[in-house]
């Protein structure tokens, strides 16, 4: 059910080295960023907007009926970009929850977007995110696959203790592939962007470690599959096959 207190923001930039102009690449007849926008709208959890510094992206989104907020080009991270967008779109501070949905997840399912809200039902949780169980050794050992190590709270919920590119945790038992979709309480996002980059964040190159090092609580919803991000030409062709039927 759509909530006026929830805002889904999709940060999108043109500066992709491996796939130039990535947000505007065609997938099944629509620009990639519009495919993501459509999935966010179908989730029906709140207002949806694309945050970008690129006029070309803004034009494509508005041409397909989407909402756009223009942001500065010099943001160090997507979190800083969505914070600027939040301030622009909601100066009266009516929004309580902000979803940060990456613009290169064209195959994400609407119900997965909605699932990131569930951990925030606990008022002790500052930030929510998602993960799926790892089933192959290749995935477990790939440094481009971020693993979340957490303490189980329920069959489908972890409290995050650490995120790493290493193969972890050691020993028998499940390992989890982190999915880069975040739900922030507004106060948590405000606190997060005010913090300096942390030592472990810089070492692992994982922004979410800044929150953990500052003592913020991140809970993780467990879902059944990892939506395919699009970072390479091969990823793009896979997304085109999936969405092209």
From Swiss-Prot:
Q: Where in the cell is it found?
A: Cytoplasm
Segments crossing the lipid bilayer: none
One molecular function GO term is: 3-deoxy-manno-octulosonate cytidylyltransferase activity
Q: Which CDD domains match?
A: CMP-KDO-Synthetase
EC number(s) recorded for this UniProt protein: 2.7.7.38
Q: Which UniProt keywords apply?
A: Cytoplasm, Lipopolysaccharide biosynthesis, Nucleotidyltransferase, Transferase
List the catalytic activities from the record: 3-deoxy-alpha-D-manno-oct-2-ulosonate + CTP = CMP-3-deoxy-beta-D-manno-octulosonate + diphosphate
Presence of keyword tRNA-binding: no
- GO cellular component terms listed in the entry, alphabetical order: cytosol
Pathway(s) the chain acts in: Nucleotide-sugar biosynthesis; CMP-3-deoxy-D-manno-octulosonate biosynthesis; CMP-3-deoxy-D-manno-octulosonate from 3-deoxy-D-manno-octulosonate and CTP: step 1/1; Bacterial outer membrane biogenesis; lipopolysaccharide biosynthesis
InterPro entries of this UniProt entry?
Answer: Cytidylyl_trans, KdsB, Nucleotide-diphossugar_trans
Instruction: Mention one GO biological process in which this protein takes part, according to its record.
Output: CMP-keto-3-deoxy-D-manno-octulosonic acid biosynthetic process
Keyword Transferase attached: yes
Family in the record: Belongs to the KdsB family.
The job of this chain, per UniProt, is described as: Activates KDO (a required 8-carbon sugar) for incorporation into bacterial lipopolysaccharide in Gram-negative bacteria.
HAMAP family per UniProt: KdsB
Return the protein name: 3-deoxy-manno-octulosonate cytidylyltransferase
| Organism encoding this protein | Rhodopseudomonas palustris (strain ATCC BAA-98 / CGA009)
Q: What is the lineage of its organism?
A: Bacteria, Pseudomonadati, Pseudomonadota, Alphaproteobacteria, Hyphomicrobiales
Q: Which gene encodes it?
A: kdsB
């Amino acid at each position: 059910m759509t909530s006026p207190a929830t805002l889904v923001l999709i940060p999108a930039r043109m500066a992709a080295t491996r796939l130039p102009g990535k947000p505007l690449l065609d997938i099944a007849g629509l620009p990639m960023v519009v495919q993501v926008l459509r999935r966010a709208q179908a989730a029906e959890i709140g207002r949806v907007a694309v945050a970008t510094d690129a006029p070309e992206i803004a034009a494509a989104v508005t041409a397909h009926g989407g909402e756009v907020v223009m942001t500065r080009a010099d943001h160090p991270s997507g979190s800083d970009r969505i914070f600027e967008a939040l301030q622009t779109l909601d100066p009266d501070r009516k929004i309580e929850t902000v979803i940060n949905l990456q613009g290169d997840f064209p195959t994400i399912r609407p119900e997965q977007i909605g699932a990131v809200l569930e951990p925030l039902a606990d008022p002790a949780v500052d930030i929510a995110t998602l993960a799926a169980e790892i089933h192959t050794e290749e995935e477990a050992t790939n440094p481009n696959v971020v693993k979340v190590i957490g303490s189980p709270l329920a069959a489908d919920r972890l409290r995050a203790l650490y995120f790493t590119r290493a193969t972890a945790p050691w020993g028998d038992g499940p390992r989890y592939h982190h999915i880069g979709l975040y739900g922030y309480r507004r106060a948590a996002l405000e606190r997060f962007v005010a913090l300096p980059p942390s030592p472990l964040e810089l070492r692992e190159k994982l922004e979410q470690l800044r929150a953990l090092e500052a003592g913020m609580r991140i809970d993780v919803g467990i879902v059944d599959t990892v939506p395919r991000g699009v970072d390479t030409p091969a990823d793009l062709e896979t997304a085109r096959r999936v969405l092209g039927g």
